[in-house]
Every structure is written in structure tokens, then in C-alpha cells.
Amino acid sequence: MTVKPDWLRVKAPQWQRVGSVKDILRDLQLNTVCEEASCPNIGECFQAGTATFLIMGPACTRACPYCDIDFEKKPQPLDSTEPERLAIAVKRLNLKHVVITAVNRDDLPDGGASQFVSCIEAIRKISPGTTIEVLIPDLCGNWQALAALLEAAPEVLNHNMETVPRLYKRVRPQADYDQSLELFNQAKRILPKVYTKSGIMVGLGETDAEVRQVMEDLRRVDCDILTIGQYLQPSQKHLGVKEFVTPEQFDVWRIYGESIGFLQVVSSPLTRSSYHAEQVQALMTRFPR
């Protein structure tokens, strides 16, 4: 792997706080994308008492070459106790904002939308003051499943575009760029008040013009929030890094994104889709719906 520049170094966390979060997760037998996807910000987020919960099992039905989550063609059946365990964790961690994401479950007719709904309802029951963000897969373009999910009224609907159209066959071979864009179109049609959010990785060989094009495409479907971060190769068997993008370039994209109408652009080398996601609460106060 290419040698990482200094700006990608992360501070060592206070392991006592990290350990307490891990203890709760282990006690309740919950997965986090922080751990499963080897996120570089795990120390900072766990230290702050936050986590992005990964539902529907630790294994995915897709094998995207950039991702560190395990692949299984036929994952385990859904666990009906998972929503309640997740809600208990939210309460025990005293989370004001929670992010729930999932592996792709192409083996399920609704892509797992009903499990998202169950998790949202369980959290609302025992922690009604917590705002909820769902980071969802593309549901294979099943807009009825999307509508069912949005009936549960999460405050934020997040779906990552991940990369530019030219690189989709290499980076997201089982996904479709236009279908992912249409998800945002459908979401705003179904639930106009929902805050929509997306994220892309850079450093995979994309150009500045291509990144800007994705940003413009997202604004055309009324996406509200964007995250941009550096792709980091999880292991030698994953896609290699083509370039380490400078912090200055991330600032350029942030400024451009704000200029074309995003309510918020979080753009830096270590930004990940749910990094500092709790900041959306301030955004919701500034731009109420």
C-alpha cells in the first residue's frame, strides 16, 4: 500500500471510554460499521460515546472491492430481537443522535427495509428524544420498500453514491449510479421533509471535474448534505489507493458544494459518512422543516 501522508494520522483515543462503548456493544451482541469496516475514526467516535450501528448481520450479499465487510451469498436470517437490543444500546449510551446502517441484503424481498422500520420504532419507544439517521443500501430499486421505510419518519435518510460514474464498474460492480440517484428523487417525493444525505470517497482515480459532477447530480435530486473523504485501502486484497488528496482540495470541494446549495458539506481526508453525524441536529435547527 502507498505510504500515508501525515494528515491521515489519527490521535490515540482514551481507551477507557472506548472500552466502555465496546462493552455495551458486546453485552447486547450488536455490530458497528466502525469495527466491521475498519473505520479510522473509531477511537474518536467511541471516545465521544457514539457509534454507527450495523444491522442485519455482519456479512453482506455484495462483494464491493473497496469494502472491508465480509461477503456471504446467503447470510443468516434476520434476528427479531435486534431492534430491541439496538434501542437499549441507544438508551445506555445516552445518544442524542443515532446512525443505523446495514449490509446489503439482496436475499430479502424488501432489502431489509422492514428491519430498519422495526429499529426506528424500538428507539422511538424508549428514547423518543433521539434523532435517527438511516444509512441505507439501494434496496435494488424497490421504491415500495423505500416508502415503507420512510413511513417510520427517520429525520435523515443517507445513501452513499461512493464514487463517480466512470468508476462504478470497478468500485461498485453490483450497483447502478442512476438508480442510486433516483433513490433521492423518490425519497423527497415520498417524504418531502426528510433531510437527505450522501457521501463519496476520493483517491480512486477520479478527477476534480467528475467529483463536481456528482455534487451537481446530487443537488438536482435535492440532496441536502454531502460528505467527502479519502479512500483508504483496508488490505492488500482490496482496491489500491490511486492518490492521497490534500486537505486543501477537500476545502475546495466543501466551498463549491456550499455554493451550489448543499445545506452542509463535510469534506476532509478522514471524513466518513457518519463522522460527526450528530451535527445534523444544529442544521435541523437552522433549516427547520
Swiss-Prot record:
Pathway: Protein modification; protein lipoylation via endogenous pathway; protein N(6)-(lipoyl)lysine from octanoyl-[acyl-carrier-protein]: step 2/2. [4Fe-4S] cluster 1 binds at residues 34, 39, 45, 274. SMART domains: Elp3. It is an enzyme of class 2 (transferase). The keyword Repeat does not apply. [4Fe-4S] cluster 2 binds at residues 60, 64, 67. The keyword S-adenosyl-L-methionine applies. Residues 46-263 form the Radical SAM core domain. Binds 2 [4Fe-4S] clusters per subunit. One cluster is coordinated with 3 cysteines and an exchangeable S-adenosyl-L-methionine. It catalyses: [[Fe-S] cluster scaffold protein carrying a second [4Fe-4S](2+) cluster] + N(6)-octanoyl-L-lysyl-[protein] + 2 oxidized [2Fe-2S]-[ferredoxin] + 2 S-adenosyl-L-methionine + 4 H(+) = [[Fe-S] cluster scaffold protein] + N(6)-[(R)-dihydrolipoyl]-L-lysyl-[protein] + 4 Fe(3+) + 2 hydrogen sulfide + 2 5'-deoxyadenosine + 2 L-methionine + 2 reduced [2Fe-2S]-[ferredoxin]. Pfam families: Radical_SAM (PF04055). One of its GO terms (molecular function) is 4 iron, 4 sulfur cluster binding. It is found in: Cytoplasm. Keywords: 4Fe-4S, Cytoplasm, Iron, Iron-sulfur, Metal-binding, S-adenosyl-L-methionine, Transferase. Its EC number is 2.8.1.8. Signal peptide: none annotated. Its cofactor is [4Fe-4S] cluster. GO terms for cellular component: cytoplasm. PANTHER family: LIPOYL SYNTHASE, LIPOYL SYNTHASE, MITOCHONDRIAL. Belongs to the radical SAM superfamily. Lipoyl synthase family. HAMAP family: Lipoyl_synth. This is Lipoyl synthase 1. It comes from Synechocystis sp. (strain ATCC 27184 / PCC 6803 / Kazusa).
